[in-house]
């Protein structure tokens, strides 16, 4: 089994494999899974720092594994104006729900009450599977790792 104890922001070296994980799994500090090429892997990283899509993991034997996001069921609310978008974000934030915020759209785990709230402010809500990369919170540091490896 491959074992990971080290995270890299980026690398110029060749990526050996990848691992595709949903948001709930990326939050864990101890993960037992299978890479995209089928290798068993154990990931042991610092608690409180979720794995980020694009981040590079280094195995004990030196292989580099890229973290990828798995599409999952999410609700995406899209606004036509900044005022109603801001109001919806405010109310969703007051509910301490996990949010991914984009330009005039906000994404959250499916919840009919939250979907109705967004619709009440004129946002259109759709439920299409997507990679969920929520904000870490007011006191979390958010930085996306990246590699310079390119898909073949």
Swiss-Prot record:
One Gene Ontology term, aspect cellular component: cytoplasm
Cellular compartment(s): Cytoplasm
Key words of the record: Chaperone, Cytoplasm, Nickel, Nickel insertion
InterPro entries registered for this protein in UniProt: UreE, UreE_C_dom, UreE_N, UreE_N_sf
Keyword Electron transport on entry: no
Protein's UniProt keywords contain Cytoplasm: yes
One Pfam family cited in the UniProt record for this chain: UreE_C
MF (Gene Ontology): nickel cation binding; unfolded protein binding
GO biological process, one term: urea metabolic process
Job description of the protein: Involved in urease metallocenter assembly. Binds nickel. Probably functions as a nickel donor during metallocenter assembly.
Family (UniProt): Belongs to the UreE family.
Protein name: Urease accessory protein UreE
